[in-house]
């Protein structure tokens, strides 16, 4: 058994030093690995999901962003300590599983965006905003992002689930519900994913 290091962080150059929860799959004759990458620690902003690919498991491509750091509107938030959250709060990524290979051959990546009012509050406490998906194409580029599930139990729906760019202008991002994709096979793959409760935890 051999162990290969995929990434080495360096705090002195401002790199993201919290790299956690690797998820590995094989797709189209390459390995695909995703993980949570954060500036400093778990449940802290900014953080994002990144991914990399490898032909042999030894040499890996430079990581790319799979699900970016964003802000989310907190008007719908019904969880504790709402007073600690600004109206546009950091949306903290979380997953137990990232990749789903659908029966039609599509590789779907997924993550959940929640909130951490303080460093002790996990974003998967039931009061997050939504689960997002996007397709990983056979050339390892990505589709647009879509919402696959609003967290209605946490107070979020199609009207109040709004994501924003964190860069300066806080521009509202267009992330539609998955059924509005023009790719019908992608929609079928998402429908199938919604039946797999373990992946959606």
Question: Model features per residue range: what roles?
Answer:
Residues 21-23, 96-98:
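Conserved beta-strand position repeated once per blade in WD40 beta-propeller domains
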Residues 1-17, 26-92, 101-201:
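Beta-rich carbohydrate-recognition and catalytic domains
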């Amino acid at each position: 058994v051999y162990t290969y290091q995929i990434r080495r962080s360096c705090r002195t150059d401002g790199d993201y030093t919290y790299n956690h929860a690797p998820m590995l799959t094989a797709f189209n004759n390459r390995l695909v690995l995703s993980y949570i990458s954060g500036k400093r620690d778990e449940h802290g902003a900014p953080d994002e999901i990144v991914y990399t690919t490898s032909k042999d498991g030894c040499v890996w491509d430079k990581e790319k962003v799979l699900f970016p750091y964003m802000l989310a509107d907190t008007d719908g938030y019904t969880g504790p300590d709402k007073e600690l959250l600004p109206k546009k709060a950091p949306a903290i990524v979380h997953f137990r599983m990232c990749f789903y290979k659908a029966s039609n051959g599509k590789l779907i990546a997924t993550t959940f965006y929640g909130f951490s009012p303080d460093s002790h509050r996990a974003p998967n406490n039931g009061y997050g905003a939504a689960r997002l998906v996007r397709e990983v194409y056979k050339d390892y580029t990505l589709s647009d992002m879509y919402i696959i599930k609003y967290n209605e139990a946490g107070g979020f729906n199609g009207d109040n689930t709004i994501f924003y760019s964190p860069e300066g202008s806080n521009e509202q991002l267009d992330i539609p519900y998955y059924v509005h994709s023009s790719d019908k096979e992608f929609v079928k793959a998402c429908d199938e994913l919604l039946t797999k409760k373990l992946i959606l935890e």
